[in-house]
Amino acid sequence: MAFGSMNSGDDSPMSDINVTPLVDVMLVLLIVFMITMPVLTHSIPLELPTASEQTNKQDKQPKDPLRLTIDANGGYYVGGDSASKVEIGEVESRLKAAKEQNENVIVAIAADKAVEYDYVNKALEAARQAGITKIGFVTETKAQ
């Protein structure tokens, strides 16, 4: 047994560790953490927006995006189908002008399937330089 009398004459050290104080401390720490944890999870102050069932009439109308077309040879066309071919610098200036006219302008990039990605990347960079954040890509759906 680990507890012997003082007069036993056995000079060997006590081999068992008393774990009762360790368990007591751990249980107290567990209780403290359990109490403080809910307070810590809700410490971020947020003001969440409220939603209403009404929508603006303006939101119901579809927004006509500004079309940026890139042909197979890397030519850029800003606007409708009858638009003339422009260089990438002119693309950026036209996108800036469109952004000044309408703050929420949407750009739809229609790139040919065979165009190199570098041309698409330049168009995306021009839109970023113009401050446009709403960009979409035009694709065709497969006929079933």
Curated annotation (Swiss-Prot):
Q: Which UniProt keywords apply?
A: Cell inner membrane, Cell membrane, Membrane, Protein transport, Transmembrane, Transmembrane helix, Transport
Q: How does it sit in the membrane?
A: Single-pass type II membrane protein
Q: Name one Pfam family in it.
A: ExbD
Quote one Gene Ontology molecular function term: transmembrane transporter activity
Where in or outside the cell it occurs: the entry states: Cell inner membrane
- TM stretches of this protein: 19-39
Top-level taxon of origin: Bacteria
Major place of residence: membrane
Q: Does the keyword DNA repair apply?
A: no
What ranges are annotated Cytoplasmic (topological domains)? 1-18
Q: Which loops or segments lie on the Periplasmic side of the membrane, by the record?
A: 40-144
Which InterPro entries does this chain map to? ExbD (IPR003400)
Q: Which GO terms describe its biological process?
A: protein transport
GO cellular component, alphabetical, reads: plasma membrane
Q: Which PANTHER family match?
A: BIOPOLYMER TRANSPORT PROTEIN EXBD, EXBD MEMBRANE COMPONENT OF PMF-DRIVEN MACROMOLECULE IMPORT SYSTEM
The record's note on quaternary structure and interaction partners says:
The accessory proteins ExbB and ExbD seem to form a complex with TonB.
Query: What is this protein's function?
Result: Involved in the TonB-dependent energy-dependent transport of various receptor-bound substrates.
Q: Which family does it belong to?
A: Belongs to the ExbD/TolR family.
**What name goes with this protein?**
Biopolymer transport protein ExbD
Q: Which gene encodes it?
A: exbD
